[in-house]
Amino acid sequence: MADLAKLVDDLSSLTVLEAAELAKMLEEKWGVSAAAAVAVAAGPAAGGAAAPAVEEKTEFTVVLAGAGDKKIEVIKEVRAITGLGLKEAKDLVEGAPKPVKESVAKDEAEKIKAQLEKAGAKVELK
């Protein structure tokens, strides 16, 4: 149990960038994605009230589909948006399609998409 307590202390002392890098390393090591889980609401019972109106999606994932011809400009924009280092941003751009930002508001996602497209990238919102 002492090892677990030490692990909790070590994880608590990580900076945000270090925690993001740790999450990325664990995703690669375990072959999983840290995308937010989506809860599924149960439908109305038979003979019940009409189904509620479809809710508008509030969280988006900005996915870099391709770097296009201006790869260096796209890498610069990815660095500015994510705060990643040069190597990490380059790896993300070269490994496209990859998520750039996850669980962001619609207006922020559209802003990021516009920035990346201005730099020459192909971007999708999911």
Curated annotation (Swiss-Prot):
Transmembrane segments: none annotated. GO terms for cellular component: cytosolic large ribosomal subunit. GO terms for biological process: translation. Keywords: Ribonucleoprotein, Ribosomal protein. GO terms for molecular function: mRNA binding; structural constituent of ribosome. Homodimer. Part of the ribosomal stalk of the 50S ribosomal subunit. Forms a multimeric L10(L12)X complex, where L10 forms an elongated spine to which 2 to 4 L12 dimers bind in a sequential fashion. Binds GTP-bound translation factors. Belongs to the bacterial ribosomal protein bL12 family. Forms part of the ribosomal stalk which helps the ribosome interact with GTP-bound translation factors. Is thus essential for accurate translation. This is Large ribosomal subunit protein bL12. The lineage of its organism: Bacteria, Pseudomonadati, Pseudomonadota, Alphaproteobacteria, Hyphomicrobiales.
